[in-house]
Amino acid sequence: MRVTLPRRLDRKVPRRGKESAFTMIEIALSIAVVAFAMVAILGVLPTGLQVQKDNREETIINADGAYLLEAIRSGHDRAGLLSNSVYFLRVNYKDGSSDVIVADDNEPLKLDGQRMVGLLSTPKSTQIAVGVSNVVIWMRALNSTAIDRDADARDVAFRYQTVLEIEPFLAHPPRLTNGLGTNDLYRIVNLQRSLYEVRMTMRWPLFNDVSTDAQRARVGTHRRTFRSQIAGSQLFYPTNVLGMERLVYFFQPSLY
């Protein structure tokens, strides 16, 4: 006679398997690997962020420099960006004096782009002791993000200093022209009047750049120099600049 056992009695009881865990050596090695990775990440991350920041600033400087040169060459602020970006302008003279145009609270100068270009195009005097030496401006980045152009973000926006020097191109040293005749000298003078050299030095970043207290301002160690030549004549006329009569200059590339 066959006897059937109940199902609960017929089930096989599983045997208890062997338990295993990490040893202290394995745990220590894992912690060491994680710690090494964290140290490597934290050590490289600041360098990577700094490189990214430097690349971004250099990209902005290259784009802004090209725009400024084109504005001076054409005599026109085509995009109308300068009037909202420049907040300090100083014309330095060779005798040590200067003319300063500023606005309160580092606000943009209340000048239209055309007058701004005319002031930036002020030529450097070729005389020894008198005349203009250079033009210095402080400005916020033209090709930065949109949030940097907001009025509330002026203190954190990328800012830099630009020094402009424009002078007639001296292609012939005086010692080579002293023995020339009148016609040849006139031809050389006419050539020099039709060709100008532009040297623009941009330095960044700016620190303590309070426009009403320019003596406290400090400039960083980064710098980029742009050099170009402009062929044509330079037109100038007096105009009203914030209540003062000043000369503004404009290049006309098509006229000689």
Model region roles, listed by residue range:
Residues 1-22:
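N-terminal leader/signal peptides at the extreme start of proteins
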Residues 3, 22, 29-32, 45-53, ...:
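Flexible, low-complexity segments enriched in proline/glycine/serine and punctuated by aromatic residues
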Residues 7, 42-43:
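Sec-dependent, cleavable N-terminal signal peptides
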Residues 11, 20, 25-30, 38:
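Generic hydrophobic-segment detector
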Residues 35-42:
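Active-site-adjacent bridging/hinge elements
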